[in-house]
């Protein structure tokens, strides 16, 4: 056992040979490296599998022995300061390692097919290997300095992966936005780390917690300064886990390849913030104000993420806002002191959301056969519909992931989300109302995504759109660059009826029609039966087996992973593996956690949350399920048009909700006008001051010296007699001035 732990330090470095060898190979032997590209995929999967098996073994040992292992090496810089680095293995480390490796392996298998057409295939796997190394290094770190080092590496890798198709301006802007937003959080984290070191004199977690708690209990430190340092530490997870108000980078991160979206939004980058708060919870828990701030930020993010997901048309952005909302639930649980519930939801959500993102990638892959390599079209749910018969396996996997996220039993997220909802009842009635209401919103927007994607008929082939016949369509090259291609003259490029009149999604049809104003301004999308294009020949198709296999494995995880945390302890049967793993665990809401849930209490608590979820599903079916005709997607606004004017206020409310959601709560616009524009103006003024004033003074002195020298040289004429004459003249002038001032005094 002890011998096994001694080799745990190697965990972060096992995936590292792949990016190193790829970099060296592409530099020195590019042709051979590219010809053996499938070998690099196999090697990446094999190395991650080793870590997964090792992490599973460590977890099994910890379930039975409940031990924590830490090994530290000391590097003495001088007599007063020494830097210690090492590894820290506890249940949280084991759980995160298993999560990172299992999802990472499945994403790598998926990416082998999904990215096979891309010229950046090897670059993609090099980034992925480095990303996995960074995350594994983060979760095994034994001190805050190591955490910060790997934290920055995770941010750098996410920058590279989000901007993978860097030739597309929108992707380049997205990765810059993610990078800059996370720099704000990272700066706060760095200040918090330095403040804690100034207070405690240690970076090591165990020493830090012990010293910190003693200082607080004995009132030997300024509580205000302590709270400030703790809050600065929390700013880092706010940005990394996309919590309000530093969440603005998350939807734009969808510009990267879909496997990256699955990895970032499931088990890696966004989970890093939750991991760090969980790791530092013994420090936060002694400061009640910080715990309340954590829970407050969490509940705001829960509601905001759900409302922003209501009207998204891009399937990946809808799932991104869903991730934001679910991360809010985890942060809420940590702020309430429910450590187990937060980590349980982290696990169940990771597998469910990875399934949904890989499913969306399969859908996008199938749509590209029709609309080309253009995210504006292949990810637009309004162009989808009726995919059930074309991609049946993807449909089943996506439906299971959707039901899980909605909290429908017995799927994974039901068990974890229900725990958080029940804990919120004990913590605050207001927080509980918001949390339960958001559970209904989650069910609504997730089934909205499902219905728009799979139900009805394929909307790409409907004909009721406006546009110019002489248009061009944009596709994405293998490097992600948008290329303009002229269409066949027999066809017209027609923009889709959209709720935002300034942005259009396009596809091919035979004719174009003008849309009346009353239809153009509709709140919800309505595609009416105008007939299909008789010249259409292409349909979506099911993805290859290497794409479907990871989805089916994640489907099994979604079905059964919730069993590890089922809180039933009756008649000698104990299914709660998670509580055994997290023993002793922090739980402020359940002091007596030996057997606080029985069958009756569980059914009573679960009935209400499941009822709310089914209500949200019903509303989604009412608005988006086509039931008047097989070719008619009925929405709420169609019903409003047949009712009297008393519905105008309700219609205005719906329009407000839509505009709020579609425009991202106007938060991006606020940041752009109040912060970005101000910073740009300041940068321009600073640039002007630097170029014109500072450089002007420096250059002016230089130019003046040059001209004085030239004049002096001209007057002197390079003759000694001239130099003596000038010298004596200057001395005479000096004496005259001195004599004048001397006699002035008398």
Swiss-Prot record:
GO BP annotations, alphabetical order: ATP synthesis coupled electron transport; electron transport coupled proton transport
Keywords linked to the UniProt accession: Chloroplast, Membrane, NAD, NADP, Plastid, Plastoquinone, Quinone, Thylakoid, Translocase, Transmembrane, Transmembrane helix, Transport
InterPro entries given in the database record: NADH_UbQ_OxRdtase_chlpt_su5_C, NADHpl_OxRdtase_5_subgr, ND/Mrp_TM, NU5C-like, Proton_antipo_N
Domain of life: Eukaryota
One Pfam family it belongs to: Proton_antipo_M
A molecular function GO annotation: quinone binding
Assigned EC number: 7.1.1.-
TM regions (residue ranges): 9-29, 40-60, 89-109, 125-145, 147-167, 185-205, 221-241, 258-278, 280-300, 327-347, 354-374, 396-416, 425-445, 547-567, 608-628, 723-743
Catalytic activity line of the entry: a plastoquinone + NADH + (n+1) H(+)(in) = a plastoquinol + NAD(+) + n H(+)(out); a plastoquinone + NADPH + (n+1) H(+)(in) = a plastoquinol + NADP(+) + n H(+)(out)
Membrane topology summary: Multi-pass membrane protein
Family: Belongs to the complex I subunit 5 family.
Subunit architecture: NDH is composed of at least 16 different subunits, 5 of which are encoded in the nucleus.
Role: NDH shuttles electrons from NAD(P)H:plastoquinone, via FMN and iron-sulfur (Fe-S) centers, to quinones in the photosynthetic chain and possibly in a chloroplast respiratory chain. The immediate electron acceptor for the enzyme in this species is believed to be plastoquinone. Couples the redox reaction to proton translocation, and thus conserves the redox energy in a proton gradient.
Protein name as annotated: NAD(P)H-quinone oxidoreductase subunit 5, chloroplastic
UniProt source species: Nasturtium officinale
Protein's gene: ndhF
